[in-house]
Amino acid sequence: MVTVTGGAIHHFAGFRADRDALALRSAILRVTARVTGWEAVLRVRCSKGLVLEAQHGHFFVRAADLLALPTVDSDSTFAVQVRVEDLSAAQSASLQAALLYTTSKGERRIRVFTVALPICTTLAPLYRSVDGDAVAALTAKMAAKKALDAKVADAREALSNKLVDVLSVYRASFSTPQTPPSQLVLPDALRSYPLHTLGIIKHPAFRAGADVDADRRVALMAHLRTGSVDAILSELSPRLFDLQQVPDSVADTAIVPPTLNLSSEKLTNSTVYVLHAGTRAVVWLGRGADPQLLGGILGDLQGRPLDANLVAGFSLPRLPYAASVRLNGLLDALALDVGRFVPVSLVLEGDPAAAVFSESMVEDRSGGAASYFEFLVAIQKQIQEKVKR
């Protein structure tokens, strides 16, 4: 229903009031307080020589360039794919989106967005000016559409093929005779594109196996179809922090500190890690962590053992200890950065619930998928074969 009415899905797996009540309350408050438009229509137009090929988001398609939106809100994102047919005689190309809607006060309004872009005759300026983050987000939306229209396996295959197509054209156009055949040649603007593509393939929405239930998979795909560029990238490449490396000033400055690579190779069980993956945050407690550090985060457990049962329903307190101040300061900075409440779950090293942490280590081999290094090697071989044809 939400896919044609402009709505959204909020998924609370195995709902527990002691764990999820705050997240549910926050979601309800945001839905009722955010700016919302009603009975809206969105028309997208483009210059002669450009053709609208596909649309992504939650809406009802009235025509190729006209989308009906029973509701539209400030959290909604829509994307369109434009195909170039013939721009040989033009010097610029224009795109325009017009949104007609009714406000909650009953006022009928229209918002118009217009962009004019220069036309290049060579590939160099195109690859130099491409928005790599937008490309990755659109790729995720295309994969979600492919999975819904066909199969998840088809979406994974299409992701690899798309990456090979983009990079093989670049290599064929810009590599030199001195470039080693085994070297992966990447444009600067798309250096993160292979990692983001692997992040999509390993994302629970597309991951192979029966460990992801249907409800979660559908909810995640809905989020990808309607998410903003920043929201999608935070899902594909979560941010990982070592709490002991987070500065004490984070509570005062609200500045998000540098992140770690998404690989377990250099992780240790003697600390506490914080993983931020867009709509959720995970606090991973190492079993070898300093008891003083754990006590500063959890407080006095009154003799209760630190195990999975305790952690599962634990509500993170705000304590006057350095570790608690740093942790809550970091979580507050992350929430401020994404502009919304971020539900936090605690997991203990080695427990089944910690799988939510390990599955976000995109650079590792996991779930039957290759590591980042293995993925790059496989992609490079496919590029070599494609360029030789």
Feature map (PLM): residue ranges:
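Extended acidic, low-complexity intrinsically disordered regions
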Residues: M1-R389
